[in-house]
Amino acid sequence: MQFVLSWVFLVGILKGVQCEVQLVESGGGLVQPRGSLRLSCAASGFTVSSNEMSWIRQAPGKGLEWVSSISGGSTYYADSRKGRFTISRDNSKNTLYLQMNNLRAEGTAVYYCARY
């Protein structure tokens, strides 16, 4: 059985500022159960390292669910993701990552990166 991890891109405009904030995600796809994927979220218009960044997901027919966050040197995970998911960032590329290992069919969802 295979399942799909989808991705989208989110675009936001800062109110009253002529600066576009953009998050462009990539890396989703079809994967076998127990397989691995790495999602990427390239940011522009702000600095990833200066903000709390998170990954959230939405499974089919379900609401939004927090997955993981990174702030400064600290990382946080939903209990169900600990040990399987790793959030990280590359400051030189201004990019956020989510490494997902030992994926399960119930992991099928749209994954979003978000800035807080």
Curated annotation (Swiss-Prot):
Segments for region (Complementarity-determining-3): 114-116
The organism's place on the tree of life at top rank: Eukaryota
Residue ranges of domain Ig-like in the record: 36-116
Matches recorded under PROSITE patterns: IG_LIKE (PS50835)
SUPFAM superfamilies: Immunoglobulin
Region (Framework-2) residue spans: 53-69
Region (Framework-1): 20-44
Sequence segments annotated as region (Framework-3): 76-113
Disulphide bridges, residue numbers: 41-113
One annotated Gene Ontology cellular component of this protein: extracellular region
Residues covered by region (Complementarity-determining-1): 45-52
Location relative to the cell: Secreted; Cell membrane
A GO molecular function held by the record: antigen binding
GO annotation, biological process: immunoglobulin mediated immune response
Stretch forming the signal peptide: 1-19
Region (Complementarity-determining-2): 70-75
Keywords from the named record: Adaptive immunity, Cell membrane, Disulfide bond, Immunity, Immunoglobulin, Immunoglobulin domain, Membrane, Secreted, Signal
Pfam families: V-set
Annotated SMART domains: IGv
Subunit architecture: Immunoglobulins are composed of two identical heavy chains and two identical light chains; disulfide-linked.
Biological function: Probable non-functional open reading frame (ORF) of V region of the variable domain of immunoglobulin heavy chains. Non-functional ORF generally cannot participate in the synthesis of a productive immunoglobulin chain due to altered V-(D)-J or switch recombination and/or splicing site (at mRNA level) and/or conserved amino acid change (protein level). Immunoglobulins, also known as antibodies, are membrane-bound or secreted glycoproteins produced by B lymphocytes.
Protein name: Probable non-functional immunoglobulin heavy variable 3-38
UniProt organism field: Homo sapiens
Taxonomy of the source species: Eukaryota, Metazoa, Chordata, Craniata, Vertebrata
Gene: IGHV3-38
